[in-house]
């Protein structure tokens, strides 16, 4: 680390930086970061998008070999970036759809899964969204991420199935709330673990996703 030599062969997945730089330009007019964002997009195209190794970038999980600890977070965030930045480009929307398929296939659980004592699957609140391979359990922020992406995909394509899926996860979000305080709890489990208030950043992500979906439903009454 002292001389800049990588400590592991893992690649950075710079999606959060791309979205930050784009937001600085769109919201604050600070466009000097646009070229940096485009360079990061080109880097992503030659690495993660090419290999489809959406490995987790969590600060509390050690680096792993390729494909052992994938997560859907950066894949979904990049899909949201594509839908926001290039809403009229069919190829961008299709790439976002591919990323959504990956996230749903690997991390969304629509009904009670097979029994597994180690992860307490019989106590999960479903439908739910799992966080990462190394922590394959339902987390509220993971559900929030899929709610946001399903909503964005619906708004770009008009596919009512996307909206229906967003609503199903949102309904589960309300069932997972603390019944007394209304706080969005981190762990979607019907046990003592589920009573832990958990991470405030996860709760705020859930609140933002629910508010956004609520505004959409107030504007539209689609036939589901």
Q: Where would I find each of the regions flagged by the language model?
A:
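Glycan-recognition and catalytic cores of secretory/periplasmic carbohydrate-active enzymes
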Residues: 1-224
């Amino acid at each position: 680390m002292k001389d800049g030599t990588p400590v592991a062969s893992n690649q950075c997945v710079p999606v959060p930086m791309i979205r930050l730089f784009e937001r600085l330009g769109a919201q604050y007019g600070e466009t000097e970061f646009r070229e940096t964002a485009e360079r990061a997009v080109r880097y992503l195209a030659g690495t993660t998008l090419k290999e489809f190794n959406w490995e987790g970038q969590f600060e509390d999980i050690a680096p792993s070999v390729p494909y052992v600890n994938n997560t859907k977070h950066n894949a979904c965030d990049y899909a949201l970036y594509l839908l926001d930045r290039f809403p009229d480009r069919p190829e961008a929307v299709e790439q976002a759809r591919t990323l959504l398929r990956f996230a749903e296939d690997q991390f969304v659980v629509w009904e009670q899964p097979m029994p597994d004592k180690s992860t307490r699957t019989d106590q999960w609140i479903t439908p739910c969204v799992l966080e990462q391979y190394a922590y394959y359990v339902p987390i509220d922020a993971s559900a929030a991420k899929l709610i946001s992406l399903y909503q964005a995909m619906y708004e770009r394509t008009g596919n009512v199935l996307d909206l229906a899926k967003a609503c199903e996860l949102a309904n589960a979000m309300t069932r997972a709330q603390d019944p007394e305080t209304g706080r969005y709890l981190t762990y979607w489990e019907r046990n003592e673990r589920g009573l832990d208030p958990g991470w405030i950043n996860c709760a705020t992500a859930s609140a933002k996703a629910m508010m956004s979906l609520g505004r959409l439903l107030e504007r539209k009454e689609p036939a589901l």
